[in-house]
């Protein structure tokens, strides 16, 4: 696992890995905006699709509704890119519209994956100023742990396009002959409207409740419920250094 404290660092490595793709590229993002970041990625996706690479994109229809052209899906398909919109917004609001896809996932050949808080928009790499200097973080994952990201993407893809595609041909071992070197355990996870379980919240509560020395939370959105607040307070009472860092001008799209 490699940690990127800044979006521009994450972007540089992402571009490098996308250019190395030989079998498939899966990308799933909440926000896509036209600009330097997206134009760079789109050029690679189009080129790789022409080379025979399986290139797929999932985007959240609400998150992208103000930023992409109305013919976006048609344009992508003309470039050879398979595309699916998560939960398209309609003229009539209902509670189902609250289900949004906030994932930021890229999987390349099932062996390299990227995730974190970085969407595909220029402010995330500080090519565009919005609310001052923009800080979001990301991670690059390599090896068998990437399978979790691959399966999350494919489960969402199958749900959107109503497919029953077999996942096995996308497993890392299918495209990487060398044995994986393991020096620890990495398990990416994700929430989904399909799960009917608050996976993320349960993991956070477990981490807080088991903390012995400190809990440091870094987030632009500090909106916690009573159970989470109680866990943090109890940890502090037990001598754990419980600190949450947030921004005074957290944005909302």
Where are these regions (language model features)?
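N-terminal localization/anchoring segments of enzymes in phospholipid and broader phosphate metabolism
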Residues: 1-202, 206, 210, 234-237, ...
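Helical hairpin unit composed of two closely spaced alpha helices linked by a short loop
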Residues: 221-240
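Glycine- and other small-residue-rich loops at beta-strand/loop junctions that grip anionic moieties
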Residues: 30, 220-221
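Conserved small/polar residues in nucleotide/adenosyl-binding loops
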Residues: 246-253
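Conserved small/aromatic sequence motifs within transmembrane helices
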Residues: 197-198, 217-218, 224-225
């Amino acid at each position: 696992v490699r940690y990127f404290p800044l979006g521009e660092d994450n972007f540089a490595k992402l571009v490098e890995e996308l250019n190395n793709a030989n079998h498939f590229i899966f990308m799933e993002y909440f926000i896509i905006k036209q600009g330097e970041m997206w134009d760079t990625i789109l050029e690679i996706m189009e080129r790789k699709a022409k080379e025979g690479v399986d290139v797929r994109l999932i985007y959240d229809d609400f998150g992208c509704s103000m930023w992409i052209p109305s013919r976006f899906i048609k344009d992508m398909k003309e470039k050879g890119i398979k595309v699916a919109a998560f939960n398209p917004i309609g003229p009539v609001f209902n509670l189902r519209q609250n289900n949004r896809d906030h994932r930021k996932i890229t999987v390349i050949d099932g062996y390299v994956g990227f995730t974190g808080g970085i969407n595909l928009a220029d402010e995330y790499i500080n090519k565009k100023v919005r609310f001052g200097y923009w800080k979001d973080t990301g991670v690059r994952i390599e090896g068998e742990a990437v399978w979790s990201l691959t399966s999350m993407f494919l489960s969402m893809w199958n749900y959107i396009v109503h497919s029953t595609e077999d996942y096995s041909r996308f497993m890392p071992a299918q495209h990487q002959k060398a044995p994986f070197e393991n020096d620890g355990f990495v398990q990416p996870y994700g929430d989904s409207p399909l799960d009917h379980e608050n996976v993320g919240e349960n993991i956070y509560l477990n981490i807080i409740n088991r903390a012995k020395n400190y809990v440091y939370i870094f987030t632009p959105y500090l909106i916690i419920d009573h159970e989470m607040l109680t866990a943090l307070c109890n940890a502090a009472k037990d001598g754990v250094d419980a600190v949450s860092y947030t921004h005074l001008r957290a944005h909302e799209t």
